[in-house]
Amino acid sequence: MEIHAGLSALKKYGNDNILPEDTINAIRDFKVAIKGPLTTPVGGFDYVCLVCAKEQNGIDGKRPEKCVKCGSEFVTKRFRSLNVGLRQILDLYACVRPVRWYNGVPCPVKRPDKLDVIVFRENTEDVYAGIEFEEGTEDAKKIITFLINVMGKSLRGDSGIGIKPISVTGTKRLVRKAINHAIQQNLPSVTIVHKGNIMKFTEGAFRDWGYELAKEEYRDKIITEQELWDEYDGKMPEGKILIKDRIADQMFQQVLLRPDEYSVIATPNLNGDYLSDACAAQVGGLGLAPGANIGDEVALFEATHGTAPKYTGMDKVNPSSLILSGVMMLKYIGWI
């Protein structure tokens, strides 16, 4: 069954309806879906063309009749990411991205085969939650005034504002899914990646809550890195999963210099977005990187890259990411 979002939805429904209720309801009913890349506006323009992704402003406050670049009539109002919208509406809290090298694929590193990880990225919180206030708006001014006058913070008055929520619930269910995967696949470790040395009450809390969940629910199956050295002199006991953590910027170095020390990664939203793409670059690029957005009831599989309108009709874009995402989907539903 084909359902619509983005350009195909605009063609079918019109009226700026780019994420129809029919689409949401169908995914909820069928429980599993796979989608292609969707255009996401980047800047502060009023409109975006869904054919060539050109962002543009209206004329005298009116919608352009045609795209200023390609002439398409499929120009719609600026919108937040449809990918983020789908994840939040359907509560697809785990973005799951396996990264490995395939024999013969050209790569920028000497030993791409050493990297074989699966990234569990929290999908609904962090700075990607979409709680933003544009610079100069009344809402932004209210928040800035509150932060300065009530909270005693120093902040420039001409700032845009974004909120970074990270919750106990969101963290623990993500880490739980990562540990369960490690158990099911007999993988040696789960690494919590965070920037808790700077953001102590969000990313630092993510780290702490992750360890807390591991000890509460998997005490007989896990050992922390601290326990490994304090109690076992660094010698890994048989049958245990190692729970460890790394600072986010250090982790980018680790996957390059010590890639074979990592198997499952659990991380907040922004870190996971950056890290999974960086890992994909080590093994040949995003064209070979599949992905899934998984909740407790619904799973949505996708290519991890965005749209590339400039390559339309040129027969040169790598379809492997979407094909491999299809393989993930078939494994998820138990068909292979």
Feature roles, as predicted:
Residues 1-8:
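A short beta-strand-loop structural module common to alpha/beta enzyme folds
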Residues 11-25, 29, 222-262:
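A structured beta-alpha segment of the ubiquitous adenosine-cofactor-binding alpha/beta core
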